[in-house]
Amino acid sequence: MQCMAVHQFAPLLSLLNCSRISSDFGRLFTPKTSTKSRSSTCHPIQCTVVNNTDRRSANYEPSIWSFDYIQSLTSQYKGKSYSSRLNELKKEVKMMEDGTKECLAQLDLIDTLQRLGISYHFEDEINTILKRKYINIQNNINHNYNLYSTALQFRLLRQHGYLVTQEVFNAFKDETGKFKTYLSDDIMGVLSLYEASFYAMKHENVLEEARVFSTECLKEYMMKMEQNKVLLDHDLDHNDNFNVNHHVLIINHALELPLHWRITRSEARWFIDVYEKKQDMDSTLLEFAKLDFNMVQSTHQEDLKHLSRWWRHSKLGEKLNFARDRLMEAFLWEVGLKFEPEFSYFKRISARLFVLITIIDDIYDVYGTLEELELFTKAVERWDVNAINELPEYMKMPFLVLHNTINEMAFDVLGDQNFLNIEYLKKSLVDLCKCYLQEAKWYYSGYQPTLQEYIEMAWLSIGGPVILVHAYFCFTNPITKESMKFFTEGYPNIIQQSCLIVRLADDFGTFSDELNRGDVPKSIQCYMYDTGASEDEAREHIKFLICETWKDMNKNDEDNSCFSETFVEVCKNLARTALFMYQYGDGHASQNCLSKERIFALIINPINFHERK
């Protein structure tokens, strides 16, 4: 299989010229914002005098997560007794898999394992089942699946890299080429079709039609349920009422964000509660999911405490009070990227990068003068610790911490794989700082970029390439010349596309706050300026670009032979985590109630757990 070509901007800029289709794919990023800020942590810009230089301030509030609080986190879910119980449950689930022979039951079990967040324990078994099903499809072995099972099998196979044809859904169309109207009566089948449609690639019109059809059906169902809510509560028996309420809950969740775009850990935390209330839930699966969640959470707490000690030792939070201190939020990004406990090193070191990128972003975006920013950019290009002497005082410490962190990462890769990657890590940082500098020049000159000019810079200035270049070296062994050429020539398409989604999601969630701060125009403003569109129209266009970029990432599944499956999945997880972080506003900078609830649910509070007797 040929490796994918690297075109520095072509895959992204082609989005700007593609023909417009409906972007109504649910309720992504709800509720919609107005131009009024939703954040309680950002205030109008104020200027303070520092060394006779007028500097902007975003007035970010200090972190609410103190060092002492983080260090006090404890979990009972560690040690041999819990590990032994988990292994016992794992054996029971394995027996359940082996004993499930009926095709639909196998698919449902795989889907449940994934949504409960425990499928990573059974990857080999799942791959064996799906490979067998794909071979059956290739051999035209027909199981006469209904809409639900056809869509479920399609989604699971595409998710695992099997390029099943979209034509399987033509069986559910009428003689005019439209999906049969009676399908709307099978609401769970329609939901399954909806989830499958988000694995579409460019020009897959059947899946595009499936998305539009299923979205309309699901919204109509939700409207009907809302109108008939009182009637349903009184006229249905307990079992039917439960099923209806369960369907409403699942459908509403899907319309907010499709399953393909959600991070595993957050979905697991939500679905465990939903699954527990199902009448046909399996108590073994439920106990396994709860125990595994809590045990993994205990490893996350240890990683977080390690990160907190590094942060305190760096003293950056004390010295740079103009910048965001968002250690906890940075770690939450890492939980989205790779939650499994065996990847503690990656979470710990990558979270440092998130923290440092946030600080450097605030230096360029808010605090530094243009002359100072040019000095910092040159220092990063030189990558010489002596360059610190040419920097203003407040820049010296962040430069030194960045320099030491990157060198430490390079040292680790050299020791593990005998490969010196410092030039590649440095290149990603230089690209980042140059983009930051260009955006600062736009700000100081009052320049209004076009959307095309903005995107050329913005997918890099979001900082994602720095994280993903590091991820490549963490999840690639051995490192090959074939794959390294992509980083020599530019960046692989999968990185560009992932980072574009991160940027667009960021813009969508932070637009109102950044508008109040007077920051550089973002994608929404650029589109409004280019076309004369309203804010609502611009938001719809950004949602459309996100959807189209996902189609490009879906297509890359057939072109990623140069990269490990783990690395490709981390790239996609970065995009998913951005959609999670910015779904309801600025989940990175704003310490609002929803952000705190998510952190408590995923990192701090265990799930109520009782071992079966």
From Swiss-Prot:
Cellular location(s): Plastid, Chloroplast membrane
GO cellular component: chloroplast membrane
Residues where Mg(2+) 2 binds: 361, 365
Transit peptide stretch: 1-46
Pathway info: Secondary metabolite biosynthesis; terpenoid biosynthesis
SUPFAM superfamilies the record matches: Terpenoid cyclases/Protein prenyltransferases, Terpenoid synthases
Primary site of residence: plastid
Reactions accelerated catalytically: (2E)-geranyl diphosphate = beta-myrcene + diphosphate
Spans traversing the lipid bilayer: 455-475
Binding site residues for Mg(2+) 3: 506, 510, 514
Function: Monoterpene synthase that catalyzes the formation of myrcene. Can use geranyl diphosphate as substrate, but not farnesyl diphosphate or geranylgeranyl diphosphate.
PANTHER family the record matches: OS04G0344100 PROTEIN-RELATED, TERPENE SYNTHASE 10
Domain notes: The Asp-Asp-Xaa-Xaa-Asp/Glu (DDXXD/E) motif is important for the catalytic activity, presumably through binding to Mg(2+).
Protein name (Swiss-Prot/TrEMBL): Myrcene synthase, chloroplastic
Organism encoding this protein: Humulus lupulus
